[in-house]
Amino acid sequence: MALQIYNTLTRRKEPFVPLEAGTVKMYVCGVTVYDYCHLGHGRTYVVWDTVRRYLISRGYAVTYVQNFTDVDDKILRRAQQEGTTMEAVAEKYIAAYFEDMDRLNVLRADSYPRATQTMPEIGALIDRLTSIGYAYPAAGDVYYSVRRFAEYGKLSGKRLAELEAGASERLQDEELARKKDPFDFALWKGAKPGEPAWDSPWGAGRPGWHIECSAMVRKSLGETIDIHAGGEDLQFPHHENEIAQSEAVTGKPLARYWMHNAFLNVVNSSGAEEKMSKSLGNFKTLRDLFEVFPPMALRLFLLKTSYRNPIAFSAEAFKGSEQNWRELEEVLQLAGWIAGQGRPATDDIESEPWVRRFNEAMDDDFNTAAALAEVIALGKQLAGRYHAAIHGTPLADPARFAREWRTFALLCDILGLKAAEPEARQSALPEAEIEAQIALRRQAREERNWAEADRIRKQLLDQGIVLIDHKEKPTTWRHADP
C-alpha cells in the first residue's frame, strides 16, 4: 500500500503526497539548550530520525531541518546559576546534544538553525504581522492578536471559548495590562536589565519562542513544507501559534502534514505512570542511562512502541529490549563469517518477504512496533541457523542465508540499529581466559552457587565482556559497547 501518515491537523491517516514528487521538506522542533537531554528527548529524535531514514529508503530526497532554541528564560536562569553567559550555556548543551544523539545513531540534520542567527528574519516577520494588523506593539513588547486569526485552534481542536475561563489568572498583572486580550502572545519582549537584547523598531529586546520557529522554517525550507513534527506537548500552544503567525502572513498552509510523538512516561514509586519531564524532577538523562544500558538497546526499546502511543519506562520493562539487542547485534556481526562460507549473495533483496512485510508496517504511519517485530523474527531465524552451523550442521543454502542476512542488515540500518565497531569492543582479556572464566561460572551454576556465578559475570563485565546465556546452548560472550 502507499505510505499513510496520521495528520494531527485532520485527525486521520492520509496518503503521503509531497509538495514536489520525490522530495520531502521536513522540520522538527529541537531542544531548548539549557540542560542535558533526557530519555523523552531521545524518543522524540529517534522517532523522527527513523521516519527520515525510512523516507530515504523509499527513494525520497529528504531535507531535514531541526532548530536549536538558544535564547530563552530557562537558558538565562542556567547562565545565572553557573555564573556564565547565555552563549556559553547554549554551546555547552548543543555539544552535549550531539554527543548523546551520536550514541543513539541519530543522523545529523541538514541544517540546525538557531534563534540567535535568525534575528533579521524574525524582525521582518514581526514587522509584517504588525503592518497587516495581526500584531500590535505595547510598551516595548509586540503581541500577536489571536482573535484576528479565524482558524486559531484548528490544529489542537481547542476553542477560545473553552480556554477563556482562567486565562487572565495565568498571566502576570503587568503583562496582562499590556495586552488587548488575555489570549494574545508575545512576538517580541522588551529588554530587561542584565539580559541579552537585540535592536528592533520596537526597542531593544528578544523574540518570543513561537515566532522563532516560524522564521526558521520560512528561512530554511520556504513558506509551505511537507512535514512539521515534534512532541505532542508542542501541539498547543507552540505549533498552534506557529500556524497562526505563518499563515496570517502567507495565506498558505505552513505544513501539509503535522506529526506528533506521544510522551515517554516513567513508573513512579506508587506504580503509577507520569510524563517524564524536568519540571516533575523524574527525568533520566541519556548520558546517565548510557552508563547502565547499551545505547542501541535504548534505541530499540524506543522503537518497540509506535510513535503515537505513550511508552512506560522502567528498568524491568527495558530488560527484554536489552536481550533483543544482544541477539540482533550478534547476527549483525556475522559479515566476516558469511564471507568465509564462500558463496556470495545475489543483489535481489527487495523481493524478500521480510522486506515486503517491513515496508507494509512502516507504510502504516511508520509502525515501528510491527516493523521491528519482523526484524527480530528474522534475526532469530538467522541466529538459529548460524548456531546450528557452528555446532556441526552445515547451512542448507549458504547463498540464501547470505541474502537474508543482507536483508536483515538493511532493515536494521533503516531503523538506525548499528553494531559497535569491532575496534571499539576489544578487551585486553585473552580469549582463553574468557573461556576459562565461563567454564568456572558454568560449574558454579551447576552447583547452584549463584553468588559465585554472578561474581564471575560481573567481573567479566567490568573487563568489557558481556555474557549471553541461552536456554538450549552454551553461554556465549561478546565485547561490551564502548
Swiss-Prot record:
Reaction equation(s) it catalyzes: tRNA(Cys) + L-cysteine + ATP = L-cysteinyl-tRNA(Cys) + AMP + diphosphate
State where Zn(2+) binds.
C29, C213, H238, E242
One Gene Ontology term of the molecular function aspect: cysteine-tRNA ligase activity
InterPro entries, from UniProt? Answer: Cys-tRNA-ligase, Cys-tRNA-synt_Ia_DALR, Cys-tRNA/MSH_ligase, CysS_C, Rossmann-like_a/b/a_fold, tRNA-synt_1_cat_dom, tRNAsynth_Ia_anticodon-bd
Q: Write down the CDD domains for this protein, in alphabetical order.
A: CysRS_core (cd00672)
How does the cofactor attach, per the note? Binds 1 zinc ion per subunit.
For this chain, the family text in UniProt reads: Belongs to the class-I aminoacyl-tRNA synthetase family.
Q: What is this protein called?
A: Cysteine--tRNA ligase
The gene it comes from is cysS
